[in-house]
């Protein structure tokens, strides 16, 4: 592969990114940098599909379990940590893998987004949280409509952060982001995940697997440890399963809601990744074929990023 660069594996949830990344990292004797905005938080393991301890023993993982759930990991902090790790491995001649479905995390590295250096404001955040997510999002639509278009109405963490930046600096977050592309080579791959029925089956199977692994116990432990008002407990999957634990829906209904909302989230992820430049969409459906397709791109594109291919 020549000089050290960066391999990115993105795509929607439940498309097999983790398995592919581990196999590729083993082939290349490399490491994995997680690009998942929930896997950074300790204790949120099963419901975020965090690589298991066994998987983490196979290949060294970074940017997992680096933050207390009561704290806020800003994009600027994530970016700084990721860039430092990339530089560390480049100095050893290693090309690391950046893997995940949080498109903004990936973009902050591949396009070099420069983020405002605004530390968390606990008192302001507490005041905003008291208003509730619906009112906060309405405020965001007024003060920073560009950011509001990028942030889902139920994404409390990013909504609060955007408002925090605005009320601290007086300048909308969307106006403070600049781009400084990195100097190293990037290979950017994404997984398609097949058709919608295949996607639904995978998501449902993964949800059942999470439950079998003890997801409900994890949620109850998190509630006991951090309280039921923890914003992360109101994120995808955790929110629906807590409805079941409160007796508001049956388990079957909670599973159906989780699958439905996860598919909706996956659609938004695909929309994001389709808009990213220089992505090679992997057409292969088996792990072995995907690895071969990636290796072929190293041969075909030795000096540039991979050619973009949109999903059909």
Curated annotation (Swiss-Prot):
<feature type="site" description="Interaction with substrate tRNA">
    <location>
        <position position="102"/>
    </location>
</feature>
<dbReference type="InterPro" id="IPR039657">
    <property type="entry name" value="Dimethylallyltransferase"/>
</dbReference>
<keyword id="KW-0808">Transferase</keyword>
<dbReference type="GO" id="GO:0005524">
    <property type="term" value="F:ATP binding"/>
</dbReference>
<dbReference type="GO" id="GO:0006400">
    <property type="term" value="P:tRNA modification"/>
</dbReference>
<keyword id="KW-0547">Nucleotide-binding</keyword>
<dbReference type="Pfam" id="PF01715">
    <property type="entry name" value="IPPT"/>
</dbReference>
<dbReference type="GO" id="GO:0052381">
    <property type="term" value="F:tRNA dimethylallyltransferase activity"/>
</dbReference>
<dbReference type="InterPro" id="IPR018022">
    <property type="entry name" value="IPT"/>
</dbReference>
<protein>
    <recommendedName>
        <fullName>tRNA dimethylallyltransferase</fullName>
        <ecNumber>2.5.1.75</ecNumber>
    </recommendedName>
</protein>
<comment type="function">
    <text>Catalyzes the transfer of a dimethylallyl group onto the adenine at position 37 in tRNAs that read codons beginning with uridine, leading to the formation of N6-(dimethylallyl)adenosine (i(6)A).</text>
</comment>
<feature type="binding site">
    <location>
        <begin position="13"/>
        <end position="18"/>
    </location>
    <ligand>
        <name>substrate</name>
    </ligand>
</feature>
<comment type="similarity">
    <text>Belongs to the IPP transferase family.</text>
</comment>
<keyword id="KW-0067">ATP-binding</keyword>
<feature type="region of interest" description="Interaction with substrate tRNA">
    <location>
        <begin position="36"/>
        <end position="39"/>
    </location>
</feature>
<feature type="binding site">
    <location>
        <begin position="11"/>
        <end position="18"/>
    </location>
    <ligand>
        <name>ATP</name>
    </ligand>
</feature>
<comment type="subunit">
    <text>Monomer.</text>
</comment>
<dbReference type="InterPro" id="IPR027417">
    <property type="entry name" value="P-loop_NTPase"/>
</dbReference>
<keyword id="KW-0819">tRNA processing</keyword>
<keyword id="KW-0460">Magnesium</keyword>
């Amino acid at each position: 592969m020549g000089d050290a660069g960066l391999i990115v594996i993105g795509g929607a949830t439940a498309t097999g990114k983790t398995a592919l990344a581990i196999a590729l990292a083993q082939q290349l004797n490399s490491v994995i940098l997680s690009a998942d905005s929930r896997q950074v938080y300790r204790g949120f393991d099963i419901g975020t599909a965090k690589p298991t301890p066994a998987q983490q023993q196979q290949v060294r993982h970074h940017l997992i379990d680096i933050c207390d759930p009561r704290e806020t990991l800003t994009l600027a902090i994530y970016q700084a940590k990721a860039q430092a790790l990339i530089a560390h491995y480049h100095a050893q001649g290693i090309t690391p893998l950046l893997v995940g479905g949080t498109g903004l995390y990936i973009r902050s590295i591949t396009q070099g987004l420069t983020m405002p250096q605004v530390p968390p404001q606990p008192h302001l955040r507490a005041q905003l949280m008291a208003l509730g997510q619906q009112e906060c999002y309405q405020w965001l639509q007024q003060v920073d409509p560009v950011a509001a278009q990028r942030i889902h109405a139920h994404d409390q963490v990013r909504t609060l952060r955007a408002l925090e930046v605005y009320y601290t600096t007086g300048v909308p977050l969307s106006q403070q982001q600049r781009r400084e592309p990195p100097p190293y080579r990037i290979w950017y791959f994404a997984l398609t995940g097949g058709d919608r029925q295949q996607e639904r089956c995978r998501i449902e199977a993964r949800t059942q697997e999470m439950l079998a692994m003890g997801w409900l116990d994890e949620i109850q432990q998190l509630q006991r440890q951090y309280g039921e008002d923890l914003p992360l407990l109101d994120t995808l999957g955790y929110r629906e399963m807590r409805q079941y634990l409160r007796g508001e829906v049956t388990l079957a209904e909670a599973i159906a809601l989780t699958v439905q909302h996860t598919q909706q989230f996956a659609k938004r992820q695909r929309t994001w990744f389709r808009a990213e430049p220089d992505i090679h969409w992997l057409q292969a459906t088996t792990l072995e074929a995907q690895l071969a397709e990636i290796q072929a791109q190293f041969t075909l594109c030795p000096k540039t990023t991979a050619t973009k291919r949109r999903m059909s």
